[in-house]
UniProtKB/Swiss-Prot annotation:
GO molecular function: rRNA binding; structural constituent of ribosome; tRNA binding
Subunit details: Part of the 50S ribosomal subunit; part of the 5S rRNA/L5/L18/L25 subcomplex. Contacts the 5S rRNA and the P site tRNA. Forms a bridge to the 30S subunit in the 70S ribosome.
UniProt name for this protein: Large ribosomal subunit protein uL5
SUPFAM superfamilies associated with the record: RL5-like
Lineage, broadest ranks: Bacteria, Pseudomonadati, Pseudomonadota, Alphaproteobacteria, Rhodobacterales
One GO BP annotation of this record: translation
Keyword hit for Ribonucleoprotein: yes
Length: 186
């Protein structure tokens, strides 16, 4: 069994040992603090059916907590919108912010287990960067994660995954994610 004090996630160790040096050489950084690294990963689940049944938000939060490995926060409406039948403070979805070891563990599971299980998967879009080194992607089915028991799921939910890096440009961020074996299609 692994000792908690000495355990390091696989991708974190890979970053320290090989990726950091490769990025420093590729972009010619003079200082180690200039090298881009992962800052956080935000998982967001907007549950459209929450307007009719608020229990679905709780169920979505439980499933997101299983996927992330930490408790999900329920997000609420900031203001009322009559056209969508939304009232202020009404629960609409849930989110989780991952940092540290859990972030690296989630990214490892996403790249190596979840994405290959997506139907008709041909790689993630290489153009989904925001101009400041952050990458956003969506999944239509949360059941691709091994933590979710398909038999106990009432409804298949989609989710947004935002990978925030300290990179200043999209090219730096793409190079960082490619080093982590993110399967870009372009």
């Amino acid at each position: 069994m692994l000792d908690q004090a000495t355990y390091t996630p696989r991708l974190k160790a890979q970053f320290r040992e090989t990726i950091r040096a490769a990025l420093k050489e590729e972009f010619g950084y003079k200082n180690d603090m200039q090298i881009p690294r992962l800052d956080k990963i935000v998982l967001n689940m907007g549950i459209g059916e929450a307007v009719k049944d608020t229990k679905k938000v709780k169920q979505g939060a439980e499933e997101l907590s299983l996927i992330a490995g930490q408790k999900a926060v329920i997000t609420k409406a900031k203001k009322s919108i009559a056209g969508f039948r939304v009232r202020e403070e009404m629960p609409l979805g849930c989110k989780v912010t991952l940092r540290g070891d859990r972030m690296y563990e989630f990214l490892d599971r996403l790249i190596n287990i979840a994405l290959p299980r997506v139907r008709d998967f041909r790689g993630v879009k290489g153009s989904a960067f925001d101009g400041r080194g952050n990458y956003a992607m969506g999944l239509k089915e949360h059941i691709v994660f091994p933590e979710i028991n398909f038999d106990k799921v009432d409804e298949v939910l989609g989710m947004d995954i935002i990978i925030c890096t300290t990179a200043r440009t999209d090219a730096e961020a793409k190079s960082l994610l490619k080093a982590f074996n993110m399967p870009f299609n372009s």
